[in-house]
């Protein structure tokens, strides 16, 4: 009986991982965004938060999930529409680490400074 329960849990974790990879195949997500996206699905499969966190950590270890890559893509797509403060706020609301946000925004500042200097 216990073995059957373990097999069912393992199958559910595989389903959760497939769902996460499906979303990541469409676009980059921050860890927090992906957690919000797959959270209800995990609950319906009766997967614990700890198991979800382990799954997300595994995706990060395999470099399929990356907050830095998400930030780089976000900044690239929004830098013509948003200012630095707006981008910083949006990234913070998406649960991205402050250090990653700070590094990305500093990179933009230095690029803008170099462009202005060359004009």
Q: What label would you give each PLM region?
A:
Residues 1-119:
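An alpha-helical, amphipathic repeat domain used for nucleic-acid recognition
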